[in-house]
Structure formats: C-alpha cells, structure tokens
Amino acid sequence: MTGPSNVAGQLALFDAESDGDALGDAYCVENDARSRRVQGITLTPAWLVERMLDEISGERFDTIVDCGAGTGRFAIAAARRFPVARIVAVEQNAELVALLRQRLWECGLGNRVAVIEGDFRVVAIPRVGRTLFIGNPPYVRHHDITAQWKEWYGLRMASLGIAASRLAGLHTHFLLRSAESMQPGDAMCFVTSAEWLDNGYGSAVRTLLGGGACLSMIGLWVADPAQPVFADALVSSVVVRADCGVEPHPVRTGMIDGQSLRTLHEVGATQLAAAPRWSVWCRPTLELPLVGIELGELFRVTRGQVTGLNAAWVLDDGQLDLPRALSVASVTRAKELIDDVVASKSGVERLRRVASLPADLEAIPDEHRDAVTRFLARARAMGADQTYIARHRKPWHAVDMRVPPAAFVSYMGRRPPVFRANPWRASFINIAHGLYPRQAIAAPVLRRLLDHLNTCTDLHAGRMYGGGMAKFEPGDIARLRVPAGVLDGTVA
C-alpha cells in the first residue's frame, strides 16, 4: 500500500494520463504497482486509448468488446466514438468492476455499456454483427498462471495446429481467445507487452496472427524501450491490429512515437510471417542484408549453471564451510564481467566460489567429511534440497559447475552485452553465457573477436524490455555476425 505522504505525488503521476478517470487514479495509488502486477492490472493512458480508436475510427462496428476492461477507459471512449455500437466491457476483478459501474453511471453511459464480470477466456459474450476486440489485456507472467490455464492455452493453440509454449503470459491467452472468437469482418486492436514479437513463447502468437489461417496483420507499432508507455510499469509495449477474413496485404509497421502511432514501413505479410523476430520491422532503419560469419558457427553458446538457490551454493567471501578443493572460483555477478575481473589471476582469486560436490559423497576424503556434512545440513536448513532445480537434479547436492569457457558474455542490461576472455579458467552461474570454441582458436584471434563484439554489438539485437532493458538469449548471441576479416586481422 502507498503511504499518505506519497499520495499527492502518485496522483500527479496518473492524472495527466487518465483523462478524468479519478477512480482509476485513486485505485492505482491505493494499490501500488507491485501489488497490481500479480493480477496484471496496468491502466492505459488516455492518449493511447484515443490513438488506438483513431486507428479503427473510419470503420463501422456493431459490437465493441473491451477485453479486460479495468475501470472502462476503452469502453467509455468507444461508447463516445461509436454512438450506435453495442459496447461490452469484460472484467474479472470485482473491485474494478465496481469502479467501472460507478464510472459508467457518472458518465451517463450505464445503458450503453454492458458489463460482464468474469474471466474473458471463458465468459459468453453477447454480440451482434461486426465485432471489434480492443483493450489492454492483463500482463501476468507465466510464473503466476496456474497449470490448468497453461494446459488450456496449449490445447487451444494445438486445436488450431499451433505448437505453443506454456511459458506464455496471460496477455497471449487474451489474444488467443479473441482470435478464436473472431468471424470474417471482425477486428482486434490491442496494446500488450512486446516480448512476444521476438521471443520463443511468442512464436505461437506470431503464427496465430500472421500465419494466414484466418487472421491478417494490419499494423504493428512498438514503443521505444527508453520511453515507457505506462506511467508506473517498465514494460515493453506494442499496439497490434489484425482483421479476420481479409486478403493479406502489406502490414504497416512503426513506432509509438510521443503520443502517436507513427508508421515507418510497409512490410509484405508473407515477409513478416517468415521473420523470426518482428520488432526489427518496426525500427526507423531496417537491417541491412546479413553479412559475415554467425558467432554460433565459431562458438557453442551456453547459459551459466543454475544452482537453484544461490544463497546456499554460492559461498560468501571468506566462508570456510567447505574445503577449497570442493568449490570452484566462479563469475556470480555481472559487474565482475563489466569490470573485467576475470582478466587477471588475482582477479579470479578474488571471485566468490561455488560449492561443487561429487555425486558420490563416499568419494570425499575422510578429512573433509565433517565439513561437507555441516555444509549440507546448512543447505537443507535453507531449503536448498527442495527447490525445483534440486528436486530435478540427481543427486540434489551435485551442482555440476560448467567447464570454464573461452569467454563470457553478460546478457541483460541497459547496454550491449559485455564480452570477456577467460584466460584464468573461472566457471560461472546463470548471470552470464559462456562461449566454447567449436575448433581451437588462437588467443590473438579471440581477442580481436571480443574487441569487435564489444564495439559493434547493437543493443537492439537482443530482446527489448521496458525501460531500455535488453536481454540476449544464447540464440541471440549465436546469431551475432562478425566480418570474416576479423578472424584474419584484415578488419579491426
């Protein structure tokens, strides 16, 4: 909850964007962003509601469905824009439903907007004629979605012939439910987080919207990650428009620029559908034809080891629970790569160590048995044997630390990844990726490669998140390209 001293400042934060939704503003102040995040409640700024309605304002709809209506910002604006259309607002949260009804009464729209309290994924929606599905679906990460709903998502996608990851967020469930409900002539216009444009779980959504089965992409506008759309949520954002039952045609792509949807390009529907990442088509400058050698041809890119509970397995500085022979010096903080601690022997000696016990504890020398017994008792007391990772690791205590790679790569931040050589053979946990040469590589060649990558890697080659944050998965690193001349020294 937010303390009284913060209320005025918080209200000022929302007031400029709410266009008179005082009830919604008050709700956001009373329930801070962290408490709302679990339910995916982030109210849409009024200017974006209007821009999305501008996108479809020249068309006629008989029914407009606000999917995950919150306090009704889309429903109320749509009722004013489309005075003849039937407006349906669907919201599951009982408190928001009460605020929505209150707002409709205050706006004199109680008879224009039908409110349905329930889960959009399963409620029956009364509709007639051509229907528009619009809104800001709740953004709930897969960690907070029950196994039952993950199964629902996978099976419903499978019924459409689409393989879907259970790691998808709740917003993808709403996109699926809308697509299932659409008939020829219907349309959708949503603002969602933008991760699905590029990442693995998003491939199902990209197939759903761009696969040509029944939907056709119309427009795609991505927010600049450094300029968040929402006042209190550092999430990436994209406005997506798709129609049902129309012939594929060029898709308008661009940016959410200031308070407008700015179209920069027209991309062939087939070209967009075939692209492994869609966000690249929304940038001001489209990528040049690919040249050079993919890094994945030279290196195997591997995530760092997942311990399951770093607090138990990563030994604090000076911690003497285990003999040194039963632990390994490891990179455990991204800052250690940024500061290039691994460049020197003394730097590696200062790294924290990670417990590395053999699977067979009987193999431990007698003089170390008591220390190991004490360490494992402490780890159990911390719950290290009950984490998901430990329960799927046989035996639970054997954290199989990675063989030292030739080089490390940081993978998340508001800067391009940092590439560092590993001459003193440190290991690493999952705060970095490791580069393992597919063939022997000379130290001068490795140095030239890393220097080039540190100088020339574009932040946008990763997966962009809100607040300018970029994440580079192993596949993203493997797809980076280097000129052939870097290998032989003819290109710096």
What are these regions (language model features)?
Residues 287-492:
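Polybasic, glycine- and aromatic-enriched phosphate-binding surface used to engage nucleic acids
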Residues 62, 131, 406:
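Conserved acidic residues
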Residues 51, 55, 99, 103, ...:
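Generic, well-ordered alpha-helical scaffold segments in large soluble proteins
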Residues 33-38, 158-162, 429-436:
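Glycine- and acidic
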Residues 117:
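Conserved residues in the N-terminal Rossmann fold of short-chain dehydrogenase/reductase
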Residues 43-51, 69-76, 84, 92-99, ...:
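Signature of N6-adenine DNA methyltransferases within the class I
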Residues 57-59, 80, 125-128, 323-325, ...:
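Flexible, charged surface loops at secondary-structure boundaries
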Residues 1-107, 124, 137, 198-207, ...:
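Class I S-adenosyl-L-methionine
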